[in-house]
């Protein structure tokens, strides 16, 4: 039986109790307060549910991650980067990026990024936990992604693309910046063919948990807010 979270506690069940099917389902209920969300990510748990349903909390096995030094840049993406087709910024329009990620897509029915999610993660953004990467073509937002940073781990949430290689460009800029800050891991949650093209690999839940304990506790020696970052444009 899946446990319901107490509204009076930020504790979660042990992730080893997560179901095998559906893979990683751990708990229901609770809320999306900044405190609970940070507590969840520190434990390798994330919310994922359809609007109107109870909040569902997940910790899948295996876990899909990208080690920054193993990020794969394809030849076509490298050409795009060298041509300087796009301009990339950080933390310039967080809510707009989330709404773009929430927009309907031809290959998916509906979206799990509700107004409730946007409101909650925007609060995390205001507190310096959640960050966005924006990809611009002229003055048009054509790609981007968002996620959370805790210690030396970035927890990716979602990305979108409205132009060729736009989201991959944003991810490449993010990875390079995280490398400069000595980030050790990018959590991608669950596998997809798209993520594997970026160099993602799968690791066990136990291995992921060990990395969480070590790397989320490392001191933050990078800015709380990223909007003043001026990314290097040469590739």
Swiss-Prot record:
It comes from Cellvibrio japonicus (strain Ueda107). Coiled coil: none annotated. NCBIfam families: aat. The lineage of its organism: Bacteria, Pseudomonadati, Pseudomonadota, Gammaproteobacteria, Cellvibrionales. It is an enzyme of class 2 (transferase). The keyword Acyltransferase applies. Pfam families: Leu_Phe_trans (PF03588). Its EC number is 2.3.2.6. Belongs to the L/F-transferase family. GO terms for biological process: protein catabolic process. This is Leucyl/phenylalanyl-tRNA--protein transferase. The keyword GTP-binding does not apply. One of its GO terms (molecular function) is leucyl-tRNA--protein transferase activity.
